[in-house]
């Protein structure tokens, strides 16, 4: 069933209130996790601190697989933020959705292309910023005309393609998962027969969606570091 988005117009700008709500919820959850994991730091980590250090090591491995740590270390916190934020965002729409007056209020924020394309645009923009900051504008500009100046139009197209594929890949996977979960939930509500037939596929798809959400958070973070490495390396 199609549900409308709760929209609000302010000074000529239209805001999706569901996106605002879910982005805020995701940010608060990630912030709380970070605070709980670091409020009582110990030399021998346990519990939440142990989990956060594992995430840090995991992201460090992603960065080191793409660039020298001396250069890539500055992107450690960016990678940490992205992988945790996107994973939490991907999970929010799995347990349930909230619909009030046919308006969808509770969902995964990454099930909206506006959110994922905004994240992708931010990542690509940051890669250009650090490309100029670390290599200088002249060296940065060379990347668009090497090995041959005739490739310049293709390089520009590549930048737009990177933004679209990075954002739409995340959106497509999460949105498709929520659509299927909604269909299965509808089957659960059709009666005893529908409930029995749909309960096992629903549980199975919930588990698979957790896996997909984790993989998509990893892929987004990995591609972020690939784009960063491409711009900050001296031989790009």
Curated annotation (Swiss-Prot):
It is a multi-pass membrane protein. Gene3D superfamilies: ATP synthase, F0 complex, subunit A. InterPro entries: ATP_syn_F0_a_bact/chloroplast (IPR045082), ATP_synth_F0_asu (IPR000568), ATP_synth_F0_asu_AS (IPR023011), F0_ATP_A_sf (IPR035908). Keywords: ATP synthesis, Cell membrane, CF(0), Hydrogen ion transport, Ion transport, Membrane, Transmembrane, Transmembrane helix, Transport. The chain crosses the membrane at residues 17-37, 80-100, 114-134, 179-199, 208-228. One of its GO terms (cellular component) is plasma membrane. GO terms for biological process: proton motive force-driven plasma membrane ATP synthesis. It comes from the Bacteria. Its main location: membrane. It holds the Pfam family ATP-synt_A. It is found in: Cell membrane. GO terms for molecular function: proton-transporting ATP synthase activity, rotational mechanism. Key component of the proton channel; it plays a direct role in the translocation of protons across the membrane. F-type ATPases have 2 components, CF(1) - the catalytic core - and CF(0) - the membrane proton channel. CF(1) has five subunits: alpha(3), beta(3), gamma(1), delta(1), epsilon(1). CF(0) has three main subunits: a(1), b(2) and c(9-12). The alpha and beta chains form an alternating ring which encloses part of the gamma chain. CF(1) is attached to CF(0) by a central stalk formed by the gamma and epsilon chains, while a peripheral stalk is formed by the delta and b chains. Belongs to the ATPase A chain family. This is ATP synthase subunit a. It comes from Anoxybacillus flavithermus (strain DSM 21510 / WK1).
